[in-house]
């Protein structure tokens, strides 16, 4: 082997690394083809960078893809003599690799000469490969400022001239429904503590692949090209779906610059790499991460520097619907908490985006064991660690994909896949207890499987539904008692303002009048009407009008009689009025003929001795004369007696009894 030689030149042909072997670090002589990677800006920035001659431990290896295409990868070590090296390679297991590395600066700790011409803020990790069949997601991993990590890239261009750019991804890429691509072989058989880092092609134009555009995006807080991702002050990360069958995870990582120590990635998570171990964390169950596995240093990093805020991106092939919570804040500091809500990425690039509410970041101080409903992707994950804090306390940004913004204090919604009916949800098992919200106890209750935090932290979780009629009787969230009373008062006022006047009923009158004297209003109203009728009747009698008993106690006096003009009071008419009425009515005969009267009328002789002494004989009401013994009397069917001559004439005119007004003779 030759001596140590590390060179970085402005060449478009060959970029080579030659390494000498050492006792604890076997290396290989490899040559990577550097084609069309360094532009004018990158070439200009690399002029002021000098490589330390003692940096001889940069292992460089290659892997073979399915179609035999060359793939290069490299590793980065630490400053200590025995440290864990950052391993970018392919393997089906998590391997920890302990190496005894010689002295000298490493690729993650290189110092800049003079005025630090090379900016290490946002240097993309780009590995181009001709394997177009490898499906994955692109990622722009931008390092923090002050030069903590320098990521270089190498590419290989195939014969067809179409090189799909591969980017280093901190977690493995899982492909469902397709064959798993061959992993990259590791140079050393020892284990790597940080796991395998897969390479994914970039085939979507949502995020540029050049490092210059990556630096521009990382320096700005706002999203320039509308890419579904987030941009923080210290780092920028963007991911977009390439295939529907990608299971994608990203761990939260942060870097706090310190003049004495250089940690490669103090907050990297050690996450299982197999699909069976990843699936229980998303979709069907709720899993939490302990603070010890999250922060190896065990310290509180809230005071130093900006920190990357990653969210795990999850995409399963049409088995788990799109769901998630997007962070609305750009700079969020976390010490031992990891907001791992996956965003609602699309299954394919051509599908329209689904409108899902987006709320601010989550700060939970208590871990609550949530009940799991089979077949429903769980939106609520456990959050551990009491040190979670937000650098923008009091700033609530609730957003919806599609540029709709909510200014409400808490956004409450539910969302389930279309395959899950509303009846399959048991809201009693999904509403958390108040102990899982926050210490202050002012949290709101949200129906569904999502707990909400308090108003002081201005945080909320989202589980969006498919419309307002969805579970109308179960989706009414309970607010604080004061807010609930205010809502009810406003609602009742609005209903009273738009309500039409209704007719009075006895029930309403009774309800309104109760409680004064203990007597229902309906009873008092009846008694009042009786008194009014009696008073009116007395007034009519005082005026000399004809008043009947029935008119007082059976229906009341007709004070306002609409048919008064149509009625005729023949008792108070004069003779002339009766003649005029007779002429107007005409000759109306309702009596019987002479033959019928003679045939049907019962006759007898009057005899005074047949009468009892106590009974006084009344005279004939028709002729008003006394009966004399031997007079002929006629008896009607009702039992009244009259003179035969008088009653004959009466029956010919009218077939009624002059006394009782009943039918005189029934033919």
Curated annotation (Swiss-Prot):
It catalyses: S-ubiquitinyl-[E2 ubiquitin-conjugating enzyme]-L-cysteine + [acceptor protein]-L-lysine = [E2 ubiquitin-conjugating enzyme]-L-cysteine + N(6)-ubiquitinyl-[acceptor protein]-L-lysine. Its EC number is 2.3.2.27. Keywords: Growth regulation, Metal-binding, Transferase, Ubl conjugation pathway, Zinc, Zinc-finger. Residues 142-163, 285-311 are annotated as: Disordered. It comes from the Eukaryota. Induction: By pantothenate. Interacts with HAL3. Probable E3 ubiquitin-protein ligase that functions downstream of HAL3 and is required for HAL3-regulated plant growth. Activation of HIP1 by HAL3 may lead to the degradation of cell cycle suppressors, resulting in enhancement of cell division and plant growth. Belongs to the RING-type zinc finger family. This is Probable E3 ubiquitin-protein ligase HIP1.
